[in-house]
Design a protein with these regions (language model features):
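Catalytic active-site module of serine/aspartate enzymes centered on a nucleophile-bearing elbow/loop
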Residues: 168-172, 176-213
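Alpha/beta-hydrolase-fold enzymes
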Residues: 21-108
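Short beta-strand/loop motif that positions the catalytic acidic residue
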Residues: 147, 153-155
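Conserved alpha/beta-hydrolase "nucleophile elbow" surrounding the catalytic nucleophile
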Residues: 3-4, 156
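Active-site nucleophile elbow and catalytic-triad environment of alpha/beta-hydrolase enzymes
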Residues: 104, 120-143
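Conserved alpha/beta-hydrolase "acid-adjacent" motif
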Residues: 136, 160-166
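Short glycine-enriched nucleophile-adjacent loop
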Residues: 8-19, 25
Length: 213
């Protein structure tokens, strides 16, 4: 099981829920539950979207575009790291200025989305926890210890919300796990396939994991 971001949360969920069936686990830029600082991010982007009067408590007749664009601008400070912006890495994505990047990349990423779909995703993300079920009854460390898969946990060193510190804590409680950070300044989006160097690191790690006995 593998996945990025919320896909990583899902991968952890499969490995904990079906420990006898998942033989390899490789979550990247994601954790086994949503930790408090991550929840702070979600509360902020939710508020940005819902502040648009056009959202109308979810009963909108047209997309709340102002709220969607504002959400994108708020997210811009979280998705990539400080050194990403300092070193102007956005130019590698075809944007000449910071302003162009914020509007062209971040705003336009969210404008096509349905607002209520995004809010449903945020709720799922905020409440993610592999131990919140009848099997583990909230015992998070027991849920982690139950994972039998050969595991490689790949946080991004500069991820601002699925932090490497949270991932390292989780890795220590998984019996057969290796902590292997993605050493990148592309923040959370190092796992999104935008930077070839980061993508190659992930691909090579997956190949190594699948090749082990």
């Amino acid at each position: 099981a593998t996945g990025w971001s919320m896909g990583a949360i899902q991968a952890f969920h499969w490995a904990a829920s079906y420990p006898d069936r998942v033989e390899r686990l490789a979550p990247f830029a994601g954790t086994a539950k949503t930790w408090p600082h991550n929840i702070v991010l979600i509360e902020g982007i939710r508020a940005a979207l819902q502040a648009d009067v056009a959202w109308n408590n979810g009963q909108y007749t047209a997309p709340p575009e102002v709220g969607l664009r504002t959400l994108g601008r708020v997210y811009a400070s979280w998705g990539f790291s400080q050194p990403f912006y300092r070193e102007e890495c956005y130019k590698a994505l075809g944007y000449e200025t910071l302003s162009e990047f914020i509007s062209g990349f971040w705003e336009e990423s969210f404008v096509p989305s349905d607002a209520n779909d995004l809010l449903a995703m945020m709720w799922t993300w905020q409440h993610a926890d592999i131990s919140q079920n009848d099997r583990y009854k909230g015992d998070f460390e027991t849920a982690l210890r139950s994972i039998q898969a050969r595991t490689v946990v790949m946080p991004v060193r500069t991820d601002l919300y699925f932090t490497p510190e949270d991932s390292e804590y989780e890795t220590k409680h998984i019996p057969n796990a290796t902590f292997k950070p993605i050493e990148s300044i592309w923040g959370h989006l190092a796992g999104f396939g935008l930077n070839p160097v980061d993508t190659a690191f992930i691909n090579n790690t997956l190949k190594e994991l699948l090749g082990t006995n």
